[in-house]
Amino acid sequence: MSEFTRREFLKTGIAVGTLTVSGGVPLMAARQTATDLVTLGRSGVKVTRLAFGTGSFSGKVQRDLGQEGFTRLVRHAYDRGIRFFETAESYGEMHKMLGVALKGIPRDSYKLMSKVTTREGVSPQEKFDELRTLANTDYFDIMLLHWQHTGTWPDDTRRWQEGILEAEGKQAVVSHGASVHGLPALRRVPGNEWLKLAMIRVNHTGKSMDAEDYNTQQPGNVSEVVEHVKKVRKEGMGVISMKLVGEGTFGREDRQKAMRFAFRNAGVDCVTVGYKTTAEIDEAIENLNMALA
């Protein structure tokens, strides 16, 4: 193809999926990317496919960067198009550090998720208010019940479930779900009408994934996890993948394989990854873009 005709070809929009036939039907869909906004099922919350996690080894990796280094990392992620940031009560100072890092960025330009520890003897509303203050935000887009690791969690956390619904009524929380660990807990996700979304451990090797013992050091049951992911997505739940890179133990090739597996095999909506360098952010974006190609 001559250079002239190549330019004319590109102008038609075929390369970006904009050429249409009669009736305006696209001949080719636009390419999907890591920073596209996707809806997390019936939660209705729109997030980027790639999230910014702050819980590497319970947040130690991110805390060790110090506020200045962590802020640079968050701003790099934002500049690269990541618009979904998540943390948890159990990650130490990460609510406060994330609030500082995001200060000055329009609140309606990104989504913020927190995860609450479902303790007895704690007021849910007081805890949500505390976390909002620490994160310097009026509301969380998503609040998860964190670290649900028993088969009885839907009954055990009833008070916290009601507390989240109350917070939603006050517009302190937009939507909700749970993060689950271990097959007994995961098996209670399908058919759970309270859940709008679930955070589930997914990768291709089973590293740090769900087994009968939630705390096992052995590979998890990949096939059963994927079965549950597919089922809950059919039910309309959103699914966020965690432990995608085996808690930081995977090399580059396995990180790429894990990303492909999460989206192409398991069919998750979104993945969260914890970072310590800007290069890791850039690589995660590249890996996800390749997985979607």
Placement of each model-derived feature along the sequence:
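Active-site mouth loops of central-metabolism enzymes
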Residues: 56-67, 114-122, 250-251
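Active-site groove signature of glycoside hydrolases
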Residues: 135-151
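Conserved, mostly hydrophobic/aromatic
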Residues: 40, 52, 85, 98, ...
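N-terminal binding-site loop/beta-alpha segment at the start of enzyme catalytic domains
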Residues: 2-109, 204, 261, 265
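Alpha-helical scaffolding within the catalytic cores
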Residues: 33-38, 95-96, 124-131, 183-184, ...
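Beta/alpha (TIM)-barrel catalytic core signal, keyed to glycine-rich beta->alpha loops juxtaposed to Asp/Glu
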Residues: 147-293
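Acidic (Asp/Glu)-rich catalytic clusters
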Residues: 42-44, 99-107, 131-137, 190-193, ...
